[in-house]
Amino acid sequence: MIEVILDTETTGLSAEKDRIVEIACVELSNHIPTKNIFHTFLNPEIKVSADAFSVHGYSDEFLSNKPKFKDVAKDFLNFIKDKKLIIHNADFDLGFLNNELKRLNIKPILKSDILDTLQIARSKFPGVGNSLDALCKRFKISIEAREKHSALLDCHLLSKVYIELIDKKELTLDLMSNDKIFNEKMKLSNENREGVVVKVSPEQMEEYKKFLKKNVSNAFALD
């Protein structure tokens, strides 16, 4: 079974007025991350709100030379085609994605194509916090690296949370052995972010670390 973990970062909270600044997709095969990753930063063509910047740390200057959504839409849609999407708080991401697609006169992503891990968590743990951070703490998944939000890092965390939510704990060892591979693929160079399936070298990882240290206050550890 092939699925895709998906997450976005945005300029703000309004799907109507704000835009996407980062999309990350991680392919799963039988619930375990594969080597196929789609990741891109985007020029939103509007300013990032102060609140959003405090969450993810992506400045207007950093995003100014990134591709626009229209430039990566085809590759993005090809990556997720015919795959179940695993999203935490899917209404948020879906609202932004479908508004971007609407601007290009492309049909929307259907809710029937999505599994919302927030809804699963609420049904299993009613009346308590079920944010990604809360679930990671509940399942003893380290969030030490998550001082700032990153769509790609959050996909990695959600892949672990997902295993716990669907009671597939026997896959935990597979996830642990997969961490090294995933970590090598999640650090992208500042030059290689054009919305393609990414295959990342160790040298590119180091470049991404340098970018974070330079551009993001209290940049999260990537090792």
Give the role of each language-model region.
Residues 1-112, 122, 132-149, 222:
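Conserved non-catalytic scaffold segment of RNase H-like nuclease domains
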Residues 84-87, 96, 100, 131-188:
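Acidic, Mg2+-coordinating catalytic module of metal-dependent nucleases/exonucleases
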Residues 164-223:
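Acidic two-metal-ion nuclease catalytic site recognized across multiple nuclease folds
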